[in-house]
Amino acid sequence: AALALRIHGAPVFFRRKGRGNYQRAPEEQLKAALAALERKAELARVQAGYVDALVAGTLPEAFHGKIMDLLVRPDKNTIEFKALETAAAARGMTAAQLVIACGGIESPRAWHQMRFVAEFFPAGTGFPPVSLSSPVDELPDAGVEAFSIDDITTTEIDDAISVEHLPDNRMRVGIHIAAPSLGIATGDPIDEIARGRLSTVYMPGEKITMLPAPVVEAYTLQEGGHRPAVSLYLIVDTTTHEVVTSETRVEKVFIKHNLRTNLLDPIVTVESLAANEGDYPHRADIVALWPLAQALHEKRQQTRIANGLRREMQRSADFNFYIDGEHVDIQQRRRGAPLDLIVAELAILANSTWGAFLAEYGVPGIYRAQRAFGPNRTRMQTSPAPHEGLGVAQYAWSTSPLRRYVDLVNQWQLVAIARHGVAAKMVAPFKPKDADLYAIVQGFDETYAAYAEHQHKMERFWCLRWLKQEARKQAVAQVVKGDMVRFEEIPLQLIVPGLGVHARGTRLLLDIVGIDELNVDLSCRLAQVLDAPVVSAEDAAAEAAETAAETAAETAAAADEAVAAMPDGAADDAGVVTAAAAPGDADDASGTSVDPRAPAQAPAAEDIEIANAEALPDVAAAGGADAVEPVHSHPVTGT
């Protein structure tokens, strides 16, 4: 019996042949099997060596060049992966933590960037060589001198403004948008690049542009020369601030100045505009635009109220990130400055007007639609519908074609109308019910959301780095809702478990217990309640109504799931393609560093974001800063 057991346990030397019978393995098979055993033993020895090196804090030579494959898309059968998992378990770390500890990745920041690039830019973030000629010499001259308003770090200048003062209490306002569509054709190599990226990716200290640098340089509205533009001209009654007529042109515009909010915000204030004071370029134009912007803003507020929403309310500060190596400087910037409002309202007006323009000529475009309440209330679609959060009848992203593909698509369609009028439906790149247009809608929404998630993560990362850098042991925060708080000094929100019941706006002193840059996590506990706001009955009722609306939205989510389960195309109606809410909507208040565990928030006034034009290519908006990309400005040092 013992012999039988030993033979049975040596399959290399003996093969089973029937019940209780064994046959000696042929010599050739035996040699091959023994060689395989030796290779396996050798691999085990190599793997053990890898484990020993990793546990000792040294990255084995064989791991160089394989780090991202091991961490992002591993082959779990390789000895490198098995060694990494074994060593990480032995040291009580994750695999990424161990690789950083061994010097395989420079820092947690590098890990976050490498993982994002590996997933969304597997071929790298560079561009192939491109050739492009600007059609500026072929375009009619607008005969105006325009100016842009942007943050000092902005390089992709999409929009500019001109003002002409007319008799009879009227003025002509020109909204001039960079026109890369004039040099890019659908399906050409540059279009393929832009469609592959769909948007510029923003994050503190850096960005990954949608278009190659030569294209941006050819079409950005840089001061000191004529630039191709798609212009929207509005004749405005300066007494009532009503838009009398509008006109769209394709032309070249002379850009006189690139104004910078960093320099002008201290000068261009509500008080200085009221007194018509200050020494800065285009003062008369900005003074004339200020009451128009206020009137446009108030009109949208009345529409919001009619939609069952409250008026927009903005927090007092925005935040700019300045990155120098691994050091971060987070500076507060006054929110809601007059220049912000002017740029915001004119951009909302342009996107709404051009949305109606597309619909009037029956040319499809890509619209943002939003219901005031309900689940999945924000969607992108190819037919016009109200954006109740912004308080406009329709809204088509059109003012950031250098950094967002949807705007480039809409610009192609607008140019077709401007040049061909009623025949535009026949010559526009995208026809009604175009399957390619539907594909762009769906692909853009998914990609844009992923980019925004990475932006939020990196904003949160730099907030944690700032706390560590400043050696903060405590910080002051305000209650947002439930266990969620918002820090006062930095744009950081997080959930503090067991916080207790506090009114919204209550100021708290928090103890900072732990900072984890790799997992982008912060642990805090309540140290002291500093002060609590006085809550009026009206505010309490409004908050209760919001809570009830959120509860109703959750209940209605089952209906959306049922629609999602329908066969492809069954849920489409008149050219509508539903998609999840994208960044910039009130649902996630793009730009606020939101805890990924945080629940989606209703379109509360507290979630309104207004920012400078680098982070805010279109506008700041409420009910969801729709058209907003990142909300914070992300200066790139050294550029």
What role is predicted for each listed range?
Residues 47-139, 143:
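Low-complexity, highly charged intrinsically disordered N-terminal segments
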Residues 1-5, 52-55, 68-72, 132-506, ...:
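Electropositive polyanion-binding surfaces
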Residues 28-36, 530-535:
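Short, charged/polar, Gly/Pro-enriched secondary-structure boundary elements
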Residues 30-49:
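Short, amphipathic alpha-helical interaction segments positioned at domain boundaries
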Residues 2-17:
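Charge-enriched amphipathic alpha-helical scaffolds
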Residues 23, 518-543:
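OB-fold/S1-family single-stranded nucleic acid-binding modules
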Residues 17-32:
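Accessory beta->alpha helical hairpin/"wing" motif in late/C-terminal subdomains of nucleic-acid enzymes
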